[in-house]
Structure formats: structure tokens, C-alpha cells
Design a protein with these regions (language model features):
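A short acidic, Gly/Pro-enriched loop at the edge of an enzyme's catalytic core
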Residues: 1-7
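Conserved hydrophobic/aromatic "anchor" residues
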Residues: 4, 96-97
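Short catalytic micro-motifs in class I SAM-dependent methyltransferases
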Residues: 11-12
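A short glycine-rich, Lys/Arg-flanked "PGG" loop and its adjoining helix->strand segment in the class I
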Residues: 20-35
């Protein structure tokens, strides 16, 4: 409890089954003023870009999965992009004093969330 200055989580959040419990656990182990930095992928907010992104990632991820003989894993990655609601909605329900979410990358499908305890 209150043990860590910062917690960093990159590209695994879509695989966490109970994100509310995970947010609470990270909050518990962070020192006061500590930061939880979360980097992951989602679908774009813009409806048109979301359609383009879905088509593009379907083709690209299934192609890469086929070439690398990891079709199951890349199919999961494609499906996982739709599993959670938009991070601006999903991550705003927590005990942290400050939350900043910034979208980066082409189509804004990568997001960076910084939570402060």
C-alpha cells in the first residue's frame, strides 16, 4: 500500500477482465501524488475514421497473423479494439484526483492516460 511512485501499463489494458478492480488496485499501491500512466489502443471517436480503421486493421492484422502463423492472436487483437468503450468515458469513473487522456497517432486510435492519486 502506498508503495509505488508510478505505475506504467502499455498495450495490455484491453486484456484486463475487470478494469475497475485494476484501477482500484493501482490506486491502492500508488503513493500520494503518484501517477498511473496507461498507453493502449482503441477505435477512433470519429464515425467515418472508425469505419476506415476497422477495415484497415482487419486487413492488416489478419494478413500479419497469416504471414506469422499467429492468426488466432492477431484476430484477438482486432476484436479487442472493440471490447471497451471509448477511454474518455470508460476511464473517467475512478478515485484519482486528475485524469488526462490524450489521443495520439494516425486516426487518434492510440491513447495515453495519466492518472494522479
Amino acid at each position: 500500500e502506498n508503495s509505488f511512485d508510478n505505475v506504467l501499463c502499455c498495450f495490455v489494458w484491453r486484456n484486463v477482465s475487470d478494469t475497475e478492480k485494476a484501477l482500484s488496485e493501482v490506486y491502492r499501491v500508488l503513493k500520494p501524488g503518484g501517477k498511473f500512466i496507461l498507453l493502449d489502443m482503441t477505435r477512433p471517436k470519429n464515425s467515418f475514421l472508425k469505419i476506415i480503421h476497422k477495415i484497415g486493421t482487419y486487413i492488416l492484422l489478419h494478413f500479419v497473423g497469416f504471414i506469422t502463423l499467429n492468426l488466432k492472436e492477431y484476430s484477438f487483437l482486432y476484436k479487442s479494439l472493440d471490447f471497451y468503450p471509448q477511454p474518455e468515458v470508460h476511464l473517467s469513473k475512478n478515485n484519482y484526483t486528475n485524469l488526462v487522456i490524450e489521443r495520439v497517432g494516425l486516426f487518434d486510435f492510440v491513447y495515453l492516460g495519466v492518472f494522479t492519486k
